[in-house]
Amino acid sequence: MFSDLCDAGLLESLCLMRMCRHLTRTGWSLKCLCSWSLLVPSGSSHCECFVSGLKKYSLFLDLLYLTVHGVGSPVLDATSDGIGASLWCRSRLCVGISTTMIIQVLFLLRSKGKRYDTRS
């Protein structure tokens, strides 16, 4: 599981560690998800982690919280099992959320949200 990777210290970036701890604590359904490499431009570490199975809208708010605090940048897209999310961080400089991304997220939540039980 993703939390095992974090506990083993395989993810070296501080922002990714914070992201991992927060996601596991707030109940994301995590799909095995992290491939990382040190062989990227400028030699910085890079990790892209995918989570899916949005259980309730409050988890999306957690995703925004992570972005606001510079932990990661969310990208939501429609997948076969609903809404998938991708967070990534290059070194300690994380990409900020854009207006276009917010519009995309709101559209997806509107079109896919009925598939999720927000009361649980």
From Swiss-Prot:
TM annotation in the entry: 93-109
The way this protein sits in the membrane is described as: Single-pass membrane protein
Location in the cell: Membrane
Q: Does the keyword Transmembrane helix apply?
A: yes
A cellular component term, taken from the record's GO annotations:
membrane
Arranged from A to Z, the UniProt key words for this protein are:
Membrane, Transmembrane, Transmembrane helix
**What's the protein name?**
Putative uncharacterized protein YJR018W
Q: Which organism is it from?
A: Saccharomyces cerevisiae (strain ATCC 204508 / S288c)
